[in-house]
């Protein structure tokens, strides 16, 4: 169990414990609300206190980040291990293979999922907290927090300079101009619960792109989402007239070329929210995407 501590500064004299927890330790309102009723979860100088207690310079406020009730249906000792790129006390960076869903389907709990793999790895009673999601067909890097606190901190950092993500994609045709920003709102397509499209009444959606390599049939791109809409990168490339290779929903499916949309979460930069360490990871482009460029 992760325990956070903070020594009260002179300028924090006279504040309430909840002010220290919300301000200096950056607990979300929801997390603080759940913790304040748990026995010995919040301590002042080693003693359990109410969150309205007044602090003084030199006092030590600590909080134990106990977890919510785990899902028993996710735990299985024989689940395949996830591909772990990095792990510390607070989080993991995973390299998700294409074809593995983030969570099990309600009607097929036995199907492989990243949540089940991670729960099996961490052990019974663990609760995986994915900071972002990748479509089943998308491969690459993502972060899983080990506590709701770290999850909240990283979710707040999404699409800011504190947490940046870049993708590699192979699009059909030769994309021009060689770089730019796609600024086109995205919303749900009429008559579909899955498909998205560019539409005037959609949500603000921005994607930065850069051409890295071209062949006669395909273009390798660097994509950086500035927002996080469902299927954003796939929709924006289709909007440009260059859908991703293998994208059955927004382009043309050809399993002889590639059996999934050619999209890979390639690079991550973020600040570890507890230690303050700057983190940077890359995951090589998978072979099924590399073959398209040969």
Residue ranges and their predicted role:
Residues 1-181, 187, 288-292:
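RNA pseudouridine synthases
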Residues 65-66, 190-193, 204, 248-254:
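Short Pro/Gly-enriched beta-strand edge/turn motifs at strand-loop
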Residues 164, 168-172, 239-254:
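Flexible glycine-rich active-site/ligand-binding loops centered on an Asp-His dyad
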Residues 50-54, 222, 260:
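Short, surface-exposed secondary-structure edge patches
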Residues 124-155, 164, 168, 184-240, ...:
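The conserved catalytic core of RNA pseudouridine synthases
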Residues 245-279:
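RNA substrate-recognition surfaces in RNA-acting enzymes
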Residues 80-81, 193-199, 253-257:
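Short, P/G- and charge-enriched loop/turn segments at secondary-structure junctions
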Residues 84, 171, 208-211, 244:
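Conserved hydrophobic positions within beta-strands
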């Amino acid at each position: 169990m992760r325990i956070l501590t903070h020594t009260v500064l002179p300028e924090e004299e006279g504040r309430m414990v909840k002010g220290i927890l919300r301000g200096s330790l950056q607990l979300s309102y929801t997390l603080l609300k759940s913790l304040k009723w748990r026995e010995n979860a919040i301590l002042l100088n080693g003693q359990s206190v109410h969150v309205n207690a007044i602090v003084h310079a030199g006092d030590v406020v600590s909080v134990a980040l106990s977890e919510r009730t785990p899902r028993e249906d996710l735990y299985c000792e024989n689940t395949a291990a996830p591909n772990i790129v990095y792990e510390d006390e607070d989080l993991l960076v995973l390299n998700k293979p294409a074809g593995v869903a983030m969570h099990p389907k309600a009607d097929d709990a036995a199907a492989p999922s990243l949540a089940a793999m991670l729960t099996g790895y961490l052990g019974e009673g663990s609760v995986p907290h994915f900071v972002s999601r990748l479509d089943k067909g998308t491969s690459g890097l993502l972060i899983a927090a080990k506590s709701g606190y770290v999850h909240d901190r990283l979710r707040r950092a999404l699409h800011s300079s504190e947490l940046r993500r870049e993708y590699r994609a192979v699009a059909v045709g030769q994309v021009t101009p060689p770089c730019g920003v796609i600024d086109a709102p995205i919303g749900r397509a009429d008559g579909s619960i899955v498909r998205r499209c560019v539409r005037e009444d959609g949500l603000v959606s921005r994607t930065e792109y850069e051409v890295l390599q071209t062949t006669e049939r395909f273009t390798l791109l660097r994509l950086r989402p500035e927002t996080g809409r469902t299927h954003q990168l796939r929709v924006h490339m289709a909007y440009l007239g260059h859908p991703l290779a293998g994208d059955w929903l927004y382009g043309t499916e050809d399993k002889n070329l590639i059996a999934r949309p050619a999209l890979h979460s390639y690079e991550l930069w973020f600040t570890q929210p507890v230690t303050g360490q700057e983190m940077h990871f890359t995951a090589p482009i998978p072979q099924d995407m590399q073959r398209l460029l040969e």
